[in-house]
UniProtKB/Swiss-Prot annotation:
One of its GO terms (cellular component) is extracellular region. Glycans are attached at N27. Homooligomer; disulfide-linked. May also be disulfide-linked to insoluble organic matrix. GO terms for molecular function: carbonate dehydratase activity; zinc ion binding. Its EC number is 4.2.1.1. This is Nacrein-like protein F.
Length: 415
C-alpha cells in the first residue's frame, strides 16, 4: 500500500549494483519516485532506500513489513477485538486502474463511509482506502507475509487510513509499547489460495459487465445469518452453520465442510488432529490447529473471485498506462468479500510498515490466520496485467516485497 501515484522507474533509466553489490544513494527527495520488484537492479527491493531520501526507512527501519510470522512465538492477547466494519456489509463503488508495475488498487469513491472497527486496539477511526492483491514471480509464492515459512499464491490487503476529522478515541490495548505514537494505517492481510472447483465457468464479457456492477447470479455467499436456507459459505450463508445442504456448513449433511469437513468444526481430526498444527495441508489443512474453537475453514470467495477475474481481464486494467493516462474501471464490491466468515476471523497483529516505498513505519497489521480461496483464473489474470511499456506483465517480477528480518513482537487473538 502507498499513498502515492509513483512514476515508472524505467522513465529515469535503470541502475545496477557495482561489483561489490552496492548501489549509490541518489540525491532524489521525491516520495513518488519509481521503484521496481526486479531484484537484480538498484531500483529493486533490496535497494529501495537508495532511490530517494524519502525511502530511507526501507533500509534502516526497525519495524519493516512483511515478515515471517512464527505462530508459536506470537503472544496471545485475550481482549483483542473481532474484526468488523461500520456500516456492516456495505457495497462500495470503487475505481480500479492499471498501476504500472505495481498491484492494481480498488479505490472507493466514497471511502469515508466505511470504517474498520477494532475497538480496544486502535485510536480513532480508520476509513477504507483501497483493496489490492499481491502476486509473486512464481505461482506458489505470491503472498508478502508467511506463517511458519509457508506462503500462498496471493495476499489481499485491505488498507484503512486514519481519519483525522473524527474524534472518537476508544481505550487502546497496548501491544508491548515498543513504538510510540499512533499508526496512520490499519492494513488487513488475507492469505489467498487458488482452486478450480466451485467457481463456475469463465465469465464472458457480457457477464463481466453485470458482475462489475455488483449483480451476481448467486447472492447466498453473504446471506442472512447462521440458520437460513442453503448458504454458500457457512457463517454468512442463508443456511450457514446448520444448513441441511450448506456448502460450508459446520453440520451440513451434504456440505463439503460438513461432518467430515475439510476444516469444519466437526472435521475428523478436530482439536487433536494426528498432525497437530501442521496437518496434511498446513494450518488450514485436514488436521487443522484447533478444529473447533480456533480452527479454520477455507472460504470459497465466489463473488470476490469473479470480480477480480473480470477486473484484471478488462483492458482498462490489463493494458499498461502511464501515470496521468490511466482509465478507471468502476467496480462494485464489499470489502468483507475478501475476509473469512466472522467467527473465523482469528488474526495475528503487529506494528509494521507499508510494504512499498516509502515504507512508512506507521501501520498496524491485522493478518488473518484463516485463508480464503479464489479461482485459479484470478491468479492467471493478475499475472497477465501489463506493468511495462513493452507489454511485460506482472508475471515476470511479481509485486511482493521479500520478508524482512525485523525482530518485532507479534500478538494473536487466539490460543
Amino acid at each position: 500500500a502507498s499513498m502515492f501515484k509513483h512514476d515508472h522507474y524505467m522513465d529515469n533509466g535503470v541502475r545496477y549494483p557495482n561489483g561489490d553489490g552496492i548501489c549509490k544513494q541518489l540525491n532524489e527527495t521525491k516520495c513518488d519516485a519509481g521503484f521496481s520488484y526486479d531484484r537484480s537492479i538498484c531500483e529493486g527491493p533490496r535497494y529501495w532506500q537508495t532511490i530517494s531520501k524519502c525511502f530511507i526507512a526501507c533500509g534502516i527501519g526497525q519495524r519493516q513489513s512483511p515478515i515471517n510470522i512464527v505462530s508459536y512465538d506470537a503472544k496471545f492477547r485475550q481482549r483483542l477485538p473481532k474484526l468488523k466494519f461500520k456500516p456492516h456489509m456495505e457495497k462500495l463503488k470503487t475505481e480500479v486502474t492499471n498501476h504500472q508495475n505495481r498491484a492494481p488498487e480498488f479505490e472507493p469513491e466514497d471511502g469515508e463511509n466505511l470504517y474498520v472497527k477494532l475497538n480496544n486496539l486502535v485510536d480513532g477511526h480508520y476509513k477504507f482506502h483501497n483493496l489490492h492483491v499481491h502476486n509473486g514471480r512464481t505461482r506458489r509464492k505470491g503472498s508478502e507475509h508467511s506463517v511458519n515459512g509457508r506462503f500462498t499464491p496471493m495476499e489481499a490487503h485491505l488498507v484503512f487510513h486514519h481519519d483525522e476529522q473524527t474524534h472518537f478515541e476508544p481505550t487502546r490495548t497496548k501491544l508491548g509499547g515498543a513504538f510510540p505514537g499512533h499508526n496512520d494505517f490499519v492494513v488487513v492481510g488475507v492469505f489467498l489460495e487458488v482452486g478450480d472447483d466451485g467457481f463456475g465457468d469463465e465469465p464472458d464479457d457480457e457477464e463481466c459487465k453485470h458482475i462489475l456492477k455488483g449483480h451476481h447470479p448467486d447472492n447466498n455467499e453473504n446471506g442472512n445469518g447462521d440458520n437460513g436456507n442453503n448458504g454458500y459459505n457457512g457463517d454468512n450463508g442463508n443456511n450457514g452453520d446448520n444448513g441441511n445442504n450448506g456448502y460450508n456448513g459446520d453440520n451440513g449433511n451434504n456440505g463439503v465442510n460438513g461432518n467430515n469437513g475439510y476444516n469444519g468444526d466437526n472435521g475428523n481430526n478436530g482439536d487433536n488432529g494426528n498432525n497437530g498444527e501442521n496437518g496434511n495441508n498446513g494450518e488450514n489443512g485436514n488436521n487443522g490447529e484447533n478444529g473447533h474453537k480456533h480452527g479454520c475453514r477455507v472460504k470459497k470467495a465466489k463473488h470476490l473471485s469473479r470480480i477480480l477475474e473480470c477486473a484484471y481481464r478488462n483492458d482498462k486494467v490489463r493494458e499498461f498506462k502511464k501515470v496521468g493516462e490511466e482509465e478507471g474501471l468502476d467496480v462494485h464490491l464489499t470489502p468483507e468479500m475478501a475476509l473469512p466468515p466472522l467467527k473465523y476471523r482469528h488474526y495475528y497483529t503487529y506494528e509494521g510498515s507499508l510494504t512499498t516505498p516509502p515504507c512508512t513505519e506507521s501501520v498496524l497489521w491485522v493478518v488473518q490466520k484463516c485463508h480464503v480461496q479464489v479461482s485459479r483464473r484470478v491468479l492467471h489474470a493478475l499475472r497477465k496485467v501489463e506493468g511495462y511499456k513493452d507489454g511485460t506483465t506482472l508475471r515476470k517480477y511479481g509485486t511482493r516485497r521479500p520478508t524482512q528480518k525485523n525482530k518485532v513482537t507479534v500478538y494473536k487473538s487466539f490460543k
